[in-house]
Amino acid sequence: MKEYIRLETKIKKEMSDLIYDRMLKGESKLAVIGLGYVGLPIALDFARKIKVVGFDINQKRVDMMKNNIDPSNELEAKDFEGCDILFSADINDLKDVEFYIVAVPTPIDDANLPDLTPLLGASKTVAQVL
């Protein structure tokens, strides 16, 4: 059993390394789903090294980011410079992506229970393109 686990771990690492290498060579892309105050900085940081699709369901926000404007007012226009990123609200732009990061809100209610509706919606979006 231990040998199986070691082999499985080795295979997972090799696959991760392969995907990472493909991204560094520009042969594959990463997507960040949800471009709020958490997702946008993550997307921009990755986009300084690899191709990124930044996806948000709000077209108005996407249009602002295409013009180097952060709708959350956390980042400046210069933070968008030098980034290889496609901002989109079109699910079809997620089809050629190999790695997905979901960064959507999980607000809590009065009983401190998370509302997973945004997470479930984002998961369904990703499922449509897998």
Labelled PLM ranges:
Residues 1-130:
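Structural/interface elements that position substrates and couple domains in central-metabolism enzymes
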